[in-house]
C-alpha cells in the first residue's frame, strides 16, 4: 500500500486525521516513516482482512430453513428491499419465500424454496439531510451550483408490489413495518433554479421527471469512471429540497463514511455529464428504458421520468459542471 502523507490525510479525511493516524500507530496497525503513514507489514494480518472497504457491518446471510445451509448473502444496505418478510428472493435461478428477517448483531434472512411465478418489488421512502459542505463550484453564469460534502440518508422500505410472470403483471400491494435506517456518507449534488429549468426548455410539469431521469442516468454512468458498481451508489432528486430550497440532484456513496465515488464524480463532473448525456441521447428508445434512464433499484417504481427533460438538463450541465478549475473549498473563504 502507498504511504499516506499527513497533509493529504487532512485534505481527504478532515482535521481530525492526524490524531486518528497517531491512534492507529499506537495500536500497532500503522507506522510513521518518511513519506507518511504506512501499514505495519509486521502485523500478522493484511489490511484487507481487517477492513471491509465496501462498508461495515457485514452482509446479511440467507439461510434455507429446510437444509439449514447458507444459500447466499445480500449487502446490509439492500437487505430491507430484497429479503423483507414475504419477499420472493431469486438465487441462481431458484426462488425462495422469505419467512423472516431477524435483527441483531448478525442479521439473518430465513427462507424456504418454492416454485412460483410470483415476484415482489419493494417501494421505499428516502430523505436526505446535508450535514456539511466541503467544496463548492459555481458556473461562470451562476446558474448551476455544485457541492461535495457529508449527508445523512434516511431510508425506509414501506411496502411491496406482488407481481406475476410473465410480464410482471400487478396483483396487489402490501404495507410493511420496516425500520428507518440512516446512513452518514459522502455525496455530491447540484442545484439550479426553476427559472433556469424553464429557460432550457423543461416544462414545469416535467421538472421532477427530468431531475429523476438525470439522477438515474448519472448513477448508471459514474461506475464507468469511478471503478465501482451501480449498487455502490444511491441518489435523490427533488424539485424543492429543504436544505437548498431549489431543484436538486444528489448522488451519494452507499457505504458508511463514503467510499470516494461521489468525490470522484464531483472532481470529474464535466466528463461524467458528457458521458451521461451521450448515453441518454444515443439510446433509441422513445420514453426511456433500462439502458438509459430506468433503474433496477429505484424505490419509486421508476416514476416519474422524463427522457426529453433529462436530455435537455444533461446537455445544459455539460457546459455547467466542474472540470479543470480547482473547486472552491469552504475553508478557503473563512
List the predicted regions and their residue ranges:
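Short cysteine clusters
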Residues: 283, 288-292
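Cys/His-rich metal-chelating microdomains
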Residues: 295
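Short, non-ligating residues that shape and space the ligands of small metal-coordination modules
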Residues: 298-299
Amino acid at each position: 500500500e502507498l504511504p499516506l502523507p499527513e497533509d493529504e490525510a487532512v485534505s481527504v479525511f478532515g482535521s481530525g486525521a492526524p490524531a486518528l493516524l497517531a491512534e492507529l500507530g499506537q495500536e500497532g496497525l500503522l507506522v510513521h516513516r518518511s513519506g507518511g503513514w504506512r501499514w505495519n507489514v509486521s502485523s500478522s494480518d493484511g489490511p484487507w482482512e481487517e477492513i471491509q472497504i465496501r462498508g461495515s457491518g457485514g452482509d446479511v446471510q440467507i439461510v434455507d430453513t429446510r437444509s439449514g445451509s447458507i444459500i447466499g448473502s445480500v449487502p446490509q444496505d439492500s437487505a430491507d428491499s430484497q429479503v423483507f418478510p414475504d419477499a420472493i428472493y431469486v438465487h441462481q435461478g431458484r426462488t425462495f419465500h422469505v419467512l423472516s428477517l431477524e435483527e441483531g448483531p448478525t442479521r439473518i434472512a430465513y427462507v424456504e424454496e418454492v416454485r412460483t411465478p410470483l415476484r415482489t418489488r419493494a417501494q421505499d421512502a428516502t430523505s436526505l439531510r446535508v450535514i456539511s459542505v466541503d467544496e463548492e463550484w459555481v458556473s461562470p453564469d451562476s446558474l448551476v451550483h455544485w457541492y461535495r460534502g457529508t449527508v445523512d440518508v434516511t431510508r425506509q422500505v414501506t411496502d411491496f408490489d406482488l407481481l406475476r410472470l410473465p410480464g410482471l403483471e400487478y396483483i396487489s400491494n402490501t404495507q410493511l413495518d420496516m425500520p428507518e435506517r440512516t446512513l452518514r456518507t459522502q455525496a455530491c449534488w447540484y442545484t439550479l433554479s426553476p427559472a433556469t429549468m424553464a429557460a432550457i426548455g423543461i416544462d414545469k410539469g416535467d421538472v421532477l421527471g427530468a431531475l429523476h431521469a438525470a439522477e438515474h442516468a448519472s448513477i448508471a454512468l459514474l461506475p464507468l469512471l469511478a471503478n465501482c458498481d451501480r449498487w455502490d451508489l444511491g441518489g435523490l432528486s427533488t424539485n424543492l429540497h429543504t436544505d437548498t430550497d431549489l431543484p436538486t440532484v444528489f448522488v451519494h456513496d452507499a457505504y458508511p463514511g463514503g467510499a470516494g465515488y461521489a468525490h470522484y464524480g464531483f472532481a470529474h463532473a464535466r466528463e461524467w455529464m458528457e458521458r451521461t448525456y451521450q448515453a441518454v441521447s444515443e439510446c433509441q428508445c422513445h420514453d426511456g428504458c433500462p439502458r438509459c434512464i430506468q433503474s433496477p433499484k429505484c424505490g419509486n417504481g421508476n416514476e416519474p421520468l422524463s427522457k426529453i427533460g433529462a436530455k435537455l438538463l444533461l446537455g445544459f450541465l455539460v457546459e455547467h459542471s466542474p472540470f479543470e478549475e480547482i473547486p472552491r473549498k469552504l475553508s478557503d473563504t473563512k
